[in-house]
Amino acid sequence: CGNGIRCVGKYLYDNGMTDGRTTITIDTLSGVKTLELTVKDGKMQSARVDMGAAILAPREIPVDMDGENVISAPIVVDEKVYHMTCVSMGNPHCVIFQKEDVDDLDLTRIGPKFEHHPLFPERVNTEFVNVLPDGSLKMRVWERGSGETWACGTGSCATGVAACLNGFANKNEDIVV
């Protein structure tokens, strides 16, 4: 959880457990994460996390599909065909780019159908994304086991990777989500 690791970093700093260091590493289930803490007047203001490389191999995500990656692949949910790009940031994500406004989605109905789809043996987090005219991305997230969530660090990372893979964004440029 990208936001969770930032909260842990703040807790550690605020409770004197970093010895004043502003670069710390934390061992997680998805590997060692490095946090760069921004401190002002002795208080931590923000944390930047190196989330690591995205995983695109279907077996490692996991998604039950063949090939080297899953980019704009069809998936049928509720008799509707969506196109998904699958990415793992240490947890599985299914990113759906769509023209329909994500605000109009009945996420409490459709989210669980993606989460429990047979293609995802460990269930999946799903990001529904609009590419806006200015190139920014508007998304809603269905988090496996939690439901709709208002902030998802790994989901934002997965969406950024998927946007690059689908030609909606460029590598090494800022992406506004």
Model-identified regions with their sequence ranges:
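Active-site proximal loop and beta-alpha junction motif in alpha/beta enzyme cores
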Residues: 1-150, 160-177
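Helical hairpin unit composed of two closely spaced alpha helices linked by a short loop
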Residues: 154-156
